[in-house]
Design a protein with these regions (language model features):
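Long, distal/terminal scaffolding or interaction modules
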Residues: 1-229
């Protein structure tokens, strides 16, 4: 049987028929094998995993996804993408390969540890706060080098300040130490990010939630050449 897929209306009708057909049959509660105490989907050879997806050979993972690289990871919470022998990762994205004790980090990798609010820090870096693009560095705050003793004192002062005078966004939401970066600081519109793929919002919904929205620019290019047949 053939279907005409050139019409959006027809395509939506076909999708509804397919979904109605699927609902007539039992659905497996979880895709996975050799697990103990897990919830979510596509979980394999893991233990104590809660509400997570695409996890493999890992233990004590909560609210995480795409943690599939081997060897597995453990003791991670709100962690998206990668893993590979990662431990104690919290609210971080695209981090992995022997990383440990990361909080609020993005794209930090290759045996880094004890990092907070960092981006693109790699190759064995440790004890960094609010740093970008450092390699084999330690005891830095906002990319500035400190001694071990100075670092400990400054971190204590910074966290105290973040709690006493927190960032407050346009919607009145309070961001103390321990919160991820506010969405309104993102240079991208909600509709330009992967968030729109997983949690779709229309423009009004996004703006109501305090997100940015970017209207696509019109690109009516004039064809100025022809291909001779």
């Amino acid at each position: 049987k053939s279907f005409y897929l050139g019409s959006y209306k027809v395509l939506q009708e076909i999708k509804k028929k397919v979904l109605d057909f699927w609902m007539k049959f039992p659905n497996k509660f979880l895709q996975g094998t050799q697990n103990v105490n897990v919830s979510g989907n596509y979980i394999y050879h893991s233990k104590d995993v809660k509400n997570s997806f695409l996890v493999r050979d890992s233990q004590n993972i909560h609210y995480s996804q795409y943690i599939q690289e081997l060897p597995g990871s453990k003791d991670c919470w709100d962690f998206s993408i990668w893993g590979e022998n990662s431990e104690l990762v919290y609210e971080s994205h695209s981090c992995g390969t022997g990383v440990q004790n990361l909080k609020f980090c993005v794209l930090c990798q290759e045996n880094v540890h004890d990092l907070e609010y960092c981006l693109f820090c790699i190759k064995g870096s440790e004890n960094l706060f609010g740093c970008i693009g450092l390699r084999q560095k330690q005891y830095c705050i906002l990319n500035k080098q400190y001694s071990k003793e100075e670092y400990a004192k400054m971190i204590e002062k910074i966290k105290k300040h973040m709690n006493e005078i927190p960032y407050i966004d346009k919607k009145g939401r309070v961001y103390k130490y321990g919160e991820y970066f506010p969405d309104e600081l993102s240079p991208h519109g909600y509709n330009e990010t992967l968030a729109q793929e997983f949690f779709p919002l229309d423009k009004d919904e996004a703006l109501t939630q305090g997100e940015k929205w970017v209207e696509p620019a019109e690109r009516n290019y004039k064809i100025d050449f022809e291909i001779n047949s």
